[in-house]
Design a protein with these regions (language model features):
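Preferential activation on post-signal-peptide N-terminal prodomains/segments
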Residues: 20-260
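Segments that shape or occlude catalytic/ligand-binding pockets
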Residues: 184, 188-346, 350-357
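Short, solvent-exposed coil/turn segments at beta-strand boundaries
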Residues: 129, 136-138, 272-279, 343-344, ...
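C-terminal motif of bacterial Sec signal peptides marking the signal peptidase cleavage site
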Residues: 15-18
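C-terminal soluble interaction/assembly domains
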Residues: 362-377
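Positively charged n-region of N-terminal signal peptides that target proteins for export
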Residues: 1-7
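Helix N-cap / beta->alpha transition motif
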Residues: 3, 299-303, 367-369
Length: 377
């Protein structure tokens, strides 16, 4: 009996010892897991600080940052995609594109232009419509009707004649909704291999407002002794149309064409659409792209700090507010021998500039290589 009791006591001690050992291991594991969780949380916190949704800072009396940070869909913090040109360009598929705009009808005339590394072809489709495509991948489809419509609007708010807001007081026209018109335009663009962002600007061109604004524009040009345009004889509901402006995109990135000089418009696709369909289309600098590799990119926080410094060194009463930082792809050059474009991920910085308190201001843009933070001009 004593031996049996001794065995049970020893067995109990072993079990207790094992439990304590197990609890000790479990406790160590919990501590380790807690440390990992805390490290992960800290890492996430640092990442969120580096790649926030918004940056706000008063750098000085004249320089402020209140910037929305815009990332592509499925963006991974600290990572960006590097792309290379791949596929058929607008110039290479110009014959198929012209056929689509001609809608099966024969082309009336073709005019070819060539000098140095530049080529273009202009096609007369009807008495009132035509299309030109260049080796720089610029497409311009135009019509007399679209010209009359575009004569009534100045959408650049840097000019005193700006009236874009007059065409943004309503959303839909009677002949088709804005959304359906946009879907049809987007479908057509996809057919010719052009991807665009849904972040578009739309001007609702109703005939009454166009008639009113056409007269204002005409009078303004006469007062400035500038060559005027030919006014439309009569306006009616048949002239109602939508004027869309958007940007070329790739994998969710806005794509900025090759830049040369002041006044580059980030919205490099514009379309006028009426009850007959597309009556005007301009595409500037489209390059088909495919992914080359994933790269590390700098944070928008660093970009904002980098841009704020030279702005702060400007000695004037002008104020600068950095309002948006958008991760894009930008074409920084083109090899004319191969026809291939050089493309890099970049941060596009939108800055509002005001010369005084009463000045409505205007927006200017700065571009930085997202990998190296080198300025792109």
């Amino acid at each position: 009996m004593r031996i049996r009791k001794l065995i049970w006591i020893l067995a109990g001690c072993c079990l207790l010892s094992g439990c304590r050992s197990g609890n000790a291991n479990l406790s160590e594991k919990n501590v380790s897991d807690t440390e990992v969780t805390e490290e992960s949380a800290e890492s996430r916190k640092e990442t969120e600080q580096d790649f926030p949704q918004r940056i706000q800072e008063d750098v000085s009396e004249n320089v402020h940052i209140d910037a929305e940070c815009v990332y592509p869909e499925n963006f991974q913090e600290g990572k960006g995609l590097k792309a290379v040109q791949s596929g058929s360009t607008l110039w290479e598929q110009r014959e198929q594109i012209v056929d689509k705009f001609a809608k099966g009808n024969p082309v009336l005339d073709v005019e070819e232009t060539s000098y140095d590394d530049f080529q273009s072809e202009s096609y007369t489709l009807t008495e009132t419509t035509g299309i030109s495509i260049t080796s720089e991948n610029v497409l311009n489809y135009f019509s007399d009707q679209a010209t009359h419509i575009l004569n009534t609007i100045m959408e650049d708010d840097r000019f005193d004649s700006y009236n874009g807001n007059e065409f943004q007081t309503t959303t839909d026209l009677a002949f088709i909704s804005q959304e359906e018109a946009w879907n049809q335009i987007k479908s057509f663009l996809q057919e010719i291999g052009v991807e665009v962002t849904d972040a578009y600007t739309c001007y609702v061109m109703d005939y009454k407002t166009m008639q009113q604004e056409e007269e204002k524009m005409y009078q303004l040009l006469q007062e400035e002794d500038t060559k005027t345009f030919e006014k439309k004889e009569q306006w009616s509901a048949d002239d109602d149309s939508y004027y869309f402006k958007t940007s070329i995109a790739w994998n969710g990135y806005p794509v900025i064409p090759y830049m040369s000089g002041e006044g580059n418009d980030e919205q490099n696709v514009s379309v006028v659409y009426d009850k007959s369909g597309i009556i005007s289309m301009m595409i500037i600098g489209h390059y088909p792209m495919q992914e080359k590799e994933e790269v590390d990119i700098e944070s928008p926080v660093k970009v904002a700090e980098l841009l704020a410094e030279p702005l702060n060194n400007i000695i004037s009463d002008t104020t600068y507010e950095i309002q948006k930082l958008t991760l894009c792809q930008v074409v920084i050059g083109k090899n004319h021998e191969t026809g291939m474009a050089e493309i890099v991920p970049c941060w596009k910085c939108s800055v509002q500039v005001k010369n005084d308190q009463e000045d409505p201001g205007y927006t200017t843009y700065y571009y930085y290589n997202a990998e190296t933070l080198e300025s792109i001009s």
